[in-house]
Each structure stands twice: as structure tokens, then as C-alpha cells.
């Protein structure tokens, strides 16, 4: 709080005063855990004021980083940690997002540096992206979750697929073909798709004889 005030930023606590309800904001940065149905937030939804999450702001200032972005219902923290350990061998690796550091903090601390970021993302964070485009992304699996926040299970699944919506052909999306829900919802993928499986070998990436093979 004190640091924000030192920078001339007004801080309001214990409520949302009506004086903040304006329609001329360029955008609003929302804590991803706050529902869009909360009256104060919903005011801006109804007036079509752009609402983004911290990940989007961090990316705007650090789009030069190299991102491996992971989301899914279960296992994403484990996968993110494993990716970080692999990237560490190259050096300049950081883990961020739902674990590790906030992306905006990294953008501030390493504005001029090249970093390889293992980034764990929740669907709450993905709901508030606009330009975020990782070089590599994966939805590791899908199962019903967060139905106290999302209007439907379909909306929850669709929010996960936002992870690749801004990607280009040269980017990669890793698709888990062992998960029928991922296959059903991973559509209109704008980047190069790498299908992987633990049970099949007619895919791009598979396991055989204790090794991982990329065709």
C-alpha cells in the first residue's frame, strides 16, 4: 500500500466507492479470483469496459520472453515445475504465474533481458487475456471444476482453450489425445499442433521402451 501511494496511486480499502464507477478507463486490471458477477465488477462488464488480468499486463511489457504456458484441471503445477527444471539447464529460466513469481514482477525486474518462462495459468487468468501468446502451450487435461465461478462446465472448458487463441503458425500447442474432452474442445487451433499420448504411438509425441519419441 505504502509503495503504491508513494507512486501517486490512490488506494481504497474495505469496499468499492461509487466514485470509481466510470466508463472512461482504458482498461481495468482485475484479481482473477474475483468473479465477474460481483456488483462492482459487473458494472464495468455491463458498460463494456475492458477487463484484463495481471498476466496480460505482464505480457505486454515482457512479450520478448520465451513462454511455455501450462493449464489444465490437474497436474499443471507438476508439469510447470518439470518444465522449469528442464529450462534451467539452458539458463535464464524462471517459473511464474500461479506458482513462482507474478509475471508483471518479472516484466519489471527483467525488462531488457531474455528469459525462458515456465508459466502456470488458471482459467481465471486466461479469462482476462487479450494479446498473450505463448510460444508453446498445453492443456494437460480437463475435468469439471470451478463451477462456483463459471456459468457452466462448457464455459470452463472453453476458457482453458484461450491459452492458444492469439498464437501464430510458428507457435506450438501440445494436445493430449488421451483426454477426449481436450480433443473435443481444442478446435480452430491457429498454431502448429503436436499430438501426444501415453497409450498410442500413432501420434507426434509418444512413449516407447522407456523413452519419449518425437516424430
Which residues does each PLM region occupy?
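NAD(P)-binding Rossmann-fold cofactor-contacting core
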Residues: 1-3
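Glycine-rich, highly charged phosphate/nucleotide-binding loops
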Residues: 5-21
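Short, flexible, mixed-charge acidic loops at enzyme active sites
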Residues: 12, 133-138, 209-214
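Phosphate-binding loop of NTP-binding sites
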Residues: 18-23, 32-177, 181-192
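Adenine nucleotide phosphate-binding catalytic loops in nucleotide-utilizing enzymes
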Residues: 22, 26, 31, 151-154, ...
Amino acid at each position: 500500500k505504502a509503495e503504491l501511494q508513494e507512486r501517486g496511486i490512490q488506494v481504497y480499502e474495505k469496499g468499492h466507492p461509487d466514485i470509481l464507477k466510470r466508463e472512461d478507463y482504458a482498461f481495468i486490471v482485475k484479481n482473477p479470483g474475483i468473479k465477474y458477477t460481483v456488483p462492482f465488477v459487473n458494472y464495468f462488464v455491463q458498460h463494456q469496459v475492458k477487463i484484463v488480468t495481471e498476466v496480460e499486463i505482464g505480457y505486454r511489457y515482457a512479450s520478448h520472453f520465451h513462454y511455455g504456458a501450462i493449464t489444465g484441471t490437474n497436474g499443471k503445477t507438476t508439469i510447470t515445475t518439470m518444465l522449469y527444471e528442464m529450462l534451467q539447464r539452458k539458463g535464464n529460466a524462471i517459473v511464474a504465474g500461479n506458482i513462482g513469481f507474478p509475471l508483471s514482477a518479472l516484466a519489471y525486474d527483467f525488462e531488457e533481458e531474455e528469459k525462458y518462462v515456465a508459466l502456470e495459468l488458471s482459467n481465471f487468468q486466461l479469462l482476462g487475456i487479450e494479446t498473450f501468446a505463448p510460444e508453446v502451450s498445453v492443456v494437460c487435461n480437463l475435468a469439471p471444476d470451478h463451477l462456483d465461478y463459471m456459468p457452466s462446465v462448457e464455459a470452463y472448458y472453453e476458457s482453458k482453450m484461450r491459452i492458444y487463441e492469439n498464437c501464430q503458425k510458428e507457435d506450438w500447442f501440445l494436445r493430449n489425445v488421451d483426454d477426449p474432452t481436450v480433443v473435443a474442445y481444442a478446435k480452430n487451433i491457429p498454431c502448429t499442433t503436436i499430438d501426444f499420448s501415453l497409450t498410442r504411438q500413432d501420434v507426434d509425441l509418444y512413449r516407447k521402451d522407456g523413452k519419449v519419441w518425437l516424430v
